[in-house]
Design a protein with these regions (language model features):
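Conserved serine/cysteine hydrolase catalytic core
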Residues: 200-253, 262
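Alpha/beta-hydrolase fold catalytic core
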Residues: 1-35, 56-59, 92-99, 123, ...
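Flexible "cap/lid" loop of the alpha/beta hydrolase fold
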Residues: 117, 124-160
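Conserved alpha/beta-hydrolase catalytic His-Asp/Glu region
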Residues: 142, 163-226
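Conserved HGGG/HGGXW glycine-rich cap/lid loop of the alpha/beta-hydrolase fold
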Residues: 27-70
Length: 288
C-alpha cells in the first residue's frame, strides 16, 4: 500500500500513454519556460516534490521513467536511456510544447546528455534553452559505484534483484544521505513503496542496464556536455558517496566555463536533504 504522501503526489498527476508504455506525469501550468525535472535510479519524480513547491508561479513538469515509481514496469523489457529520452520528448510534446529548461539528477543526467546530443544534431523535437546536471555519474569511470550496482549490472544481477527486500533496500539507501540530514523513516517507506510497486524491485537488474550504456555512449554523451551551445551548469552536493566530486572535476574538465554551485557536505539526494538550498541553486543556474 502506498503511503499517504505518495498517494497525494499520485493524485496530482496522470498516466500518459507512450509507444513504450504508460508513464506517470505531473505538471503545473505557469510562467515559462517550463522546468523539466528528471529523476534518478532507483527512485522517481517523488524526489522533486519539495522542489516543485518552491518554484512559485513557474510552469514545471516531471515524470516517472518507464520501469520506475508509478509508471508501467514491463518485463521482459530492454530498458534503455535512449528509450527514456524518447519518452521525455513525448511527455514534453503533450504537456509543455513551448520552450523548457532542464534539471536532471543521477540517471536522469545521462538522459539529459542524450537530449543535448539530439539538440546538437538538430533532432530534438522541442526547444531546450538551459540545463543543469546534479549528482549524476555521467563520467562513470570517475564514479564510486556501490557494490549493489556492480552486482546488478553483472551476471548475478537477477539473483540480487529477486533477493532485494525492504530492510536491505533501506539500509543501502540510507548510506546515500549525509549525517546532517539522515534518511527519515517516512522517506524510506515512501521510496520503498514506489520502487516495490508492481514488484519493481524484481527488475532492478534490467533497470541497471543504463550503467552499461554510460560506457557504450560515453563519447556521444561526454561530447554533448563539451559541445552543447547553450548554458549548462552543475549543481553538486559534495558529500555524495557515489557521484563524487571526482565526477564533478571531470565535468569541469569537459566544460571549463560552466557555472558550478556546490552544496558542501550534502549527500546524493540534495533535493530531499536541503530543498531550499537546492532549489535556490537550480533557479540561479537556470535563471528562472
Amino acid at each position: 500500500m502506498l503511503p499517504d504522501s505518495v498517494r497525494q503526489w499520485q493524485a496530482g498527476g496522470r498516466m500518459l500513454s507512450t509507444a513504450a508504455g504508460s508513464v506517470f506525469v505531473r505538471s503545473k501550468p505557469g510562467t515559462g519556460p517550463a522546468v523539466l525535472l528528471l529523476h534518478g535510479f532507483p527512485s522517481s519524480s517523488y524526489d522533486y516534490r519539495d522542489v516543485t513547491q518552491r518554484l512559485g508561479d513557474r510552469a514545471w513538469l516531471t515524470l516517472d521513467f518507464l520501469g520506475f515509481g508509478l509508471s508501467d514496469k514491463p518485463r521482459p523489457h530492454r530498458y534503455s536511456l535512449l528509450e527514456q529520452a524518447d519518452i521525455v520528448a513525448a511527455v514534453v510534446a503533450d504537456v509543455a510544447p513551448g520552450p523548457v529548461v532542464l534539471l536532471a539528477h543521477d540517471m536522469g543526467t545521462s538522459v539529459a546528455t542524450e537530449l543535448l546530443a539530439r539538440d546538437i544534431a538538430g533532432t530534438l523535437p522541442f526547444e531546450l534553452q538551459r540545463a543543469v546536471l546534479t549528482n549524476g555519474s555521467v563520467i562513470i569511470e570517475r564514479a564510486s559505484l556501490r557494490r549493489s550496482q556492480k552486482i546488478l549490472r553483472g551476471p548475478f544481477g537477477p539473483i540480487l534483484a529477486r533477493l532485494t527486500n525492504e530492510r536491505g533496500f533501506v539500509r543501502g539507501f540510507a548510506e546515500l544521505f549525509s549525517a546532517q540530514h539522515p534518511l527519515t523513516d517516512d522517506e524510506a517507506r515512501a521510496q520503498w513503496a514506489l520502487m516495490a510497486r508492481d514488484d519493481g524491485q524484481r527488475i532492478l537488474h534490467l533497470l541497471c542496464a543504463y550503467l552499461n550504456e554510460r560506457v557504450r555512449f560515453a563519447a556521444r554523451w561526454h561530447g554533448a556536455v563539451r559541445d552543447w551551445g547553450k548554458p549548462l551548469g552543475f549543481l553538486w552536493a559534495t558529500g555524495d558517496p557515489v557521484a563524487t566530486t571526482n565526477v564533478l572535476a571531470g565535468l569541469r574538465e569537459l566544460r571549463p566555463a560552466a557555472e558550478v554551485i556546490e552544496l558542501p557536505g550534502i549527500g546524493h539526494y540534495p533535493q530531499i536533504e536541503v530543498p531550499d538550498e537546492f532549489t535556490a541553486g537550480a533557479r540561479r543556474l537556470l535563471q528562472i
